[in-house]
């Protein structure tokens, strides 16, 4: 997508304590601010690395905060992602590509859709609607009719998101603009 960063995200069946022990074998710069969500971070050379245990979260309808439930499989973890374009994984050791929700096809086609019904996805985390708008404006994606309808019908759900998270997403949308070109 023409954007290189210095961060790597991993997901694993290892629990946070095990992940932290493994990371400490490679660096002393680790942090566990996301431990409650199953995430351990580390600085390895020039890379910021975050490793999160597979999750299969449960959400209360009046809150954006999930009840953290560790998952058992990669596929279960990927289905909880915001969009299919973010629901792909590469097994680091075997280099096996996992794309159970056709995210690569959606990238090539410039389509933004959710791994499961958008009403559930946006109910779980209403900020995803704002992320859809950002991906559309910055990366040139087109949302599916189902995603657009869910965004329209569920716009009021944004009210349960903290003002800080809304501000941060708006800042990303307005300040990090690049010309749309998801398939270039």
Spell out what each predicted region is:
Residues 1-182:
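Catalytic cores of the polymerase beta-like nucleotidyltransferase superfamily
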